[in-house]
Amino acid sequence: MTSLTILPITVDDLPFVRAMLYEAAFWRATGDAPPIAAALCAPELAIYVDQWGRSGDAGLLARVAGRPVGAVWVRRFPDHAHGYGYVDELTPELSIAVAPERRGYGIGGCLLSAMLALLRIDGARRVSLSVETDNPARSLYERFGFTPAAATEGAITMLLTLTPD
């Protein structure tokens, strides 16, 4: 049996994290997604990983047999330049993706569980995310206790209040 390892994201992992950002943004795989390089240059996506290592940035990478298969990361945004799942400057926004060929094996749940534990240890009071209403990952977030906080056309900002285990 191949083992799953989850380790902190390093600067060397950023190309893979960017690829996972692309997977998170264009999860439908309908063939009409823009090329990855062009998509990741768009300011609304670039803010999720550009200048990685700022205060409040934290991320985890999942590997199977030494190969990266998924990532989860959080970032706090200022009010004047924030992401899709923004709630406030104190609430980190979570991003997560698993490589398409590795979805459905529980890797996303392992990553999410590990990140929520890390956030609790770090004293975060809550965490947010944005998910499209028809994204199957929404059920994962609901299982972990995320609830709708706001809605826009086709997407929901979800929020989880973190309490000590």
Per-range role (PLM):
Residues 1-15, 19, 23-24, 163-165:
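Conserved N-terminal entry element of GNAT/NAT acetyltransferase domains
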Residues 21, 26-27, 35-64:
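Active-site rim helix/loop that mediates acceptor-substrate recognition in acyltransferases
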Residues 63, 68-95:
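Conserved acyl-donor/pantetheine-binding loop and adjacent beta-alpha core of acyl/acetyltransferases
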Residues 93-104, 131:
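A short, internal acetyl-CoA/4′-phosphopantetheine-binding micro-motif in the GNAT/acyltransferase core
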Residues 104-117, 121, 142-143:
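Conserved acetyl-CoA-binding loop-helix of GNAT-fold acetyltransferases
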Residues 108, 112, 134-137, 153-160:
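Short glycine/proline-centered loop/turn elements that form peptide/ligand docking sites
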Residues 119-132:
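Conserved GNAT acetyl-CoA-binding A-motif
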Residues 142-152:
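Conserved acetyl-CoA-binding loop of GNAT-fold acetyltransferases
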